[in-house]
């Protein structure tokens, strides 16, 4: 019982750290792409469309990451760092984990499509709408944030599976131990 409870506490703290990282990632997702904002000319239409798609995706992952941020308060309220979970706690954490798993899977799919779209954007006319750029300016695509997104969402998916699983095992182990003690005391 002590080992599984120790694992529960480790998952508890990992959950908190990963949810904070996930929230920070959702806030910072678009910062590398601020130079793609405000294009209106027909020649830069692909940039405008791509930026709009990125904004829409960013909005979704922000709201989904809020679930994780709120979940931090929930795990403290349920006292999962120093208490064996009851059925209610398991159901609540499992529901939260399902939303977070959806976020991770959605993000994996969307990162792939956005990266593919990013490859096809024509950046050669950016200089027409940006006085800071010369006509021979070459835009360098930035993929780091996508790769970080894969890592962050992989961690979200892993903890979304691990934490409820460990809570369920802890709960069942506690019930089993209680039944064994009841038989011994009878």
Where are these regions (language model features)?
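Alpha-helical transmembrane segments of polytopic membrane proteins
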Residues: 58-67, 145-156
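Membrane-interfacial loop-to-transmembrane alpha-helix junctions, especially the N-terminal start
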Residues: 5-12, 34-38, 88-90
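Cytosolic juxtamembrane helix at the C-terminal end of the final transmembrane segment
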Residues: 2-7, 74-88, 108-122, 155-186
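Alpha-helical transmembrane segments and their immediate interhelical/interface regions
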Residues: 46-85
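Hydrophobic alpha-helical membrane-insertion segments
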Residues: 13-28, 92-113
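Interfacial non-cytosolic loop connecting adjacent transmembrane helices
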Residues: 32-58, 107-148
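Alpha-helical transmembrane segments
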Residues: 18-24, 67-75, 99-105, 155-165
């Amino acid at each position: 019982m002590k080992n599984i409870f120790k694992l529960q506490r480790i998952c508890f703290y990992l959950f908190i750290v990963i949810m904070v990282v996930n929230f920070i990632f959702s806030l910072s997702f678009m910062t590398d792409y601020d130079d793609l904002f405000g294009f209106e000319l027909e020649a830069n239409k692909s940039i405008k469309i791509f930026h709009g798609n990125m904004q829409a995706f960013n909005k979704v992952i922000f709201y989904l990451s809020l679930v994780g941020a709120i979940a931090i308060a929930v795990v403290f309220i349920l006292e999962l760092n120093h208490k064996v979970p009851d059925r209610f706690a398991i159901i609540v954490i499992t529901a939260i984990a399902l939303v977070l798993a959806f976020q991770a899977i959605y993000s994996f799919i969307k990162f792939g499509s956005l990266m593919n779209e990013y490859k096809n954007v024509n950046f050669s006319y950016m200089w027409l709408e940006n006085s800071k750029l010369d006509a021979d300016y070459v835009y360098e695509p930035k993929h780091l944030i996508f790769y970080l997104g894969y890592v962050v969402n992989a961690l979200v998916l892993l903890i979304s599976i691990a934490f409820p699983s460990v809570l369920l095992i802890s709960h069942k182990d506690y019930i089993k131990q209680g039944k064994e003690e009841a038989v011994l005391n009878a």
